């Protein structure tokens, strides 16, 4: 089955059977549930929703299905077209809209698409609201508008530019200093909407852009998740072009990775580390990441004399914790930068601007910058379970075994050792337990993972 319904939206593969894949009927049903929930929540006579999409091949089809379903409910739709996840998040409050829908399956391959749901702040809907929307969809509890009360459709293609203006206006972004450096940068946007947004931002900052896979046609030239094994082309190109560094974004531009001037991975985990280092050097405040993110961020927070706290995995959880501790920057170790000065959402445009500001101020190469940060190495693994095995029982047994260590149970089980940690999480969509480890060397991280895999398998 390739249809996953969750509190943050619905995602699946295009084609196939209803309720097994993301078919037109599933898209309509879920859009109707969201629209019905919004109407009930707002209590307003006229409800407005912003819709934007990445460049996936199925994007236009899904967009038409979703927007005309909302219009059928009597909801006005602002179609901002080819866009990015953070751009839609910024557009919702600018439009004074009641919600937003982002049509993207993020880093999933081209056959996938999804509806991601926003509230009137341009933030992902809460757990409670997501459950209410799922219930409406399950019960087909929709009431469509009569012919005289259908919604209206408007198109507005200016929001990427408006988003860029907001990024450039941030007090910690220093366009003049960046322009003086005359950086040369290679951009891999995996032929999605980052190919529109990132070069446009860089050009405004006086950066010479070398485009690689920047045609927003939805034909991804490699696996779109920005991991080392997928990024051989840009690593090679950075060296060939003698570029200062490379920028990689996923299809909806909420994840950001850098390539050093030597053609090596800066490390997705270190995107947030570098941006936080810059921000904390200018303003003191707390920082937040998720439990599976590198300890390097905690080290940077300590260096600047501020507090670090960890949230459960997932953007909604990180944002909730950031608000609780009034963090000035946060995110996830997969290259997601959340900078509340602009909005509470992962935003690669903000990340690029802060990173360039850091480079302009510090001088030196990107490779030298990376080497200035604490060195940690991660290992990511999983163990397969049968349907009969209860993952919660395994995690409970491991918690009891390591009760003498520092443990956290807000999201699975995380065990912190002196120079390493392990995070065990059950999947909500398949019968597996994920094992994340981090240590001072790759060998130690792999060995720690292997040890925990063996210990859990002994319990099965």
Regions found by a protein language model. Give the residues of each.
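An N-terminal, well-structured beta->alpha segment
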Residues: 1-68, 72-73, 152-185
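Short glycine-centered, acidic/aromatic-flanked micro-motifs in structured strand/loop junctions
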Residues: 52-53, 187-189, 260, 341, ...
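Gly/Ser/Thr-enriched, mixed-charge loops and adjacent short helices
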Residues: 13, 113-241
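Proline/glycine-rich low-complexity loops and linkers
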Residues: 131-165, 169, 260-333, 337-338
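Short beta-strand-to-turn element immediately C-terminal to the catalytic PLP-Schiff-base lysine
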Residues: 117-120, 257-261, 338-340
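Phosphate-binding and adjacent anionic-ligand microenvironments
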Residues: 245, 283-460
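N-terminal small/polar loop signature for handling phosphorylated ligands or for N-terminal nucleophile
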Residues: 36, 40, 48-112, 200-259
């Amino acid at each position: 089955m390739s249809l996953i319904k969750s509190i943050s939206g619905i995602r699946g593969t295009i084609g196939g059977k209803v309720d097994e894949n993301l078919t037109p009927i599933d898209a309509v049903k879920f859009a109707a549930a969201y629209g019905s929930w919004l109407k009930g929540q707002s209590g307003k006579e006229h409800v407005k929703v912003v819709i934007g999409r990445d460049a996936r091949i199925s994007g236009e089809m899904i967009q038409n299905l979703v927007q005309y379903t909302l219009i059928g409910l009597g909801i006005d739709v602002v179609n901002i077209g080819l866009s990015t996840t953070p751009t839609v998040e910024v557009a919702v409050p600018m439009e004074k809209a009641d919600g937003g829908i982002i049509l993207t399956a993020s880093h999933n391959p081209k056959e996938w698409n999804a509806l991601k749901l926003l509230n009137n702040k341009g933030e992902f809907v809460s757990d409670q609201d997501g459950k209410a929307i799922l219930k409406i969809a399950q019960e087909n509890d929709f009431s469509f508008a009569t012919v005289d009360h259908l919604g209206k459709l408007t198109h507005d293609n200016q929001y990427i530019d408006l988003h860029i203006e907001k990024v450039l206006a941030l007090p910690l972004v220093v366009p003049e200093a960046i322009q003086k450096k005359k950086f040369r940068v290679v951009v891999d946007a995996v032929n999605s909407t980052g190919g529109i947004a990132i070069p446009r931002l860089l050009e405004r900052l006086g950066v010479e852009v070398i485009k690689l896979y920047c045609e927003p046609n939805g034909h991804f030239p490699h696996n779109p998740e920005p991991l080392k094994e997928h990024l051989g082309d840009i690593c090679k190109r950075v060296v060939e072009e003698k570029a200062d560094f490379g920028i990689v974004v996923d299809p909806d531009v909420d994840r950001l990775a850098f390539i050093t001037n030597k053609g090596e991975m800066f490390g997705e985990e270190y995107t947030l580390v570098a941006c936080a280092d810059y921000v904390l050097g200018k303003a003191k405040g707390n920082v937040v990441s998720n439990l599976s993110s590198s300890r390097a961020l905690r080290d940077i927070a300590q260096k600047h004399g501020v507090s670090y706290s960890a949230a459960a995995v997932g953007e909604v959880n990180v944002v909730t914790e950031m608000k609780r501790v009034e963090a000035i920057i946060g995110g996830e170790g997969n290259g997601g930068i959340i900078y509340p000065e602009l909005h509470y959402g992962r935003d690669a445009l903000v990340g690029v601007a802060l990173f360039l500001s850091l480079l302009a101020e510090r001088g030196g190469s990107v490779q030298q910058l990376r080497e200035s940060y604490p060195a940690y190495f991660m290992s990511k693994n999983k163990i397969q379970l049968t349907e009969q095995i209860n993952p919660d029982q395994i995690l409970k047994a491991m918690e009891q075994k390591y009760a003498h260590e520092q443990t956290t149970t807000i999201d699975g089980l995380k065990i912190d050792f002196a120079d390493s940690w392990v995070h065990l999480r059950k999947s909500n969509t398949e019968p597996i337990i994920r094992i994340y480890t981090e240590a001072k060397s790759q060998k130690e991280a792999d060995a720690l993972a292997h040890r925990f895999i063996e210990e859990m398998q002994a319990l099965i």
